[in-house]
């Protein structure tokens, strides 16, 4: 995929670790001499994949038996709250995953951040003919009059709908609410074809 660039950062974020509230490795979940740990990561969130694979390797080196599962955000948090998984290492707070934490927070424990310099953004292809969000409304036709978004339940989606679109006069653009994999597929297809595209995105990714 060709390079992309940010038009504007509209929310700071912290990447943190969330676990099942009752999660414990003391004498439970053992198979022979190996304790089991179940990690879960969100589809399409590459920084989550990286940190999950890192901790999978670290835990396996310490003698744990580790299972890593990939899901969309909704089923991920539901499964975590239901006890199907022990740890999620890529919780985006306070905005992107806010709705899920509000819904399932009583069943979860926040273990703290590992990256406090993340951000939510609107991004375009590197060679796009605009340089800022202020220019997007008057050049919407160059981007098929669309902003490609992710899941409806994501805080990134709600802040785009409630703050970015009205704040920058983008009400006449079609905000396509889809999924993270669908957004990334649209982004890749457009950049590979040399077309202009505007998406909701985040850093790191």
Annotate each predicted stretch with a short phrase.
Residues 17-22:
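C-terminal motif of bacterial Sec signal peptides marking the signal peptidase cleavage site
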Residues 24-39, 59-60, 137-144:
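Immediate post-signal peptide segment of exported/extracytoplasmic ligand-binding proteins
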Residues 32-47, 64-69, 144-148:
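Short, well-ordered beta-strand elements
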Residues 43-46, 67-79, 175-186:
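Short helix-initiation/N-cap motifs at beta->coil->alpha
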Residues 55-62, 142-174:
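Ligand-binding cleft/hinge of the Venus flytrap
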Residues 85-89, 159-205:
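Ligand-binding pocket segment of bilobal, Venus flytrap-like solute-binding proteins
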Residues 106-153:
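A conserved helix-loop-strand patch within extracytoplasmic ligand-binding domains
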């Amino acid at each position: 995929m060709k390079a992309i660039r940010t038009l504007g950062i509209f929310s700071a974020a912290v990447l943190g670790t969330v676990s099942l509230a009752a999660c414990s490795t003391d004498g439970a979940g053992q198979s022979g001499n190996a304790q089991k740990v179940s990690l879960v990561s969100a589809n399409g969130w590459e920084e989550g994949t990286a940190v999950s694979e890192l901790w999978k390797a670290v835990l396996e080196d310490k003698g744990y038996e580790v299972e890593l599962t990939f899901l969309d955000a909704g089923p991920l948090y539901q499964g975590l709250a239901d006890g199907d998984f022990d740890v999620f290492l890529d919780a985006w707070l306070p905005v992107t995953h806010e709705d899920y934490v509000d819904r399932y927070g009583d069943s979860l424990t926040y273990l703290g951040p590992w990256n406090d310099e993340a951000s939510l953004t609107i991004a375009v292809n590197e060679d796009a003919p605009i340089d800022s969000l202020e220019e997007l409304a008057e050049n919407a036709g160059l981007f098929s009059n669309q902003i490609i978004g992710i899941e409806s339940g994501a805080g990134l989606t709600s802040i785009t709908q409630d703050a970015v679109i009205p704040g920058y006069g983008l009400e006449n653009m079609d905000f396509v609410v889809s999924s993270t994999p669908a957004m990334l597929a649209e982004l890749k297809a457009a950049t590979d074809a040399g077309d202009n595209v505007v998406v909701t995105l985040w850093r790191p990714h």
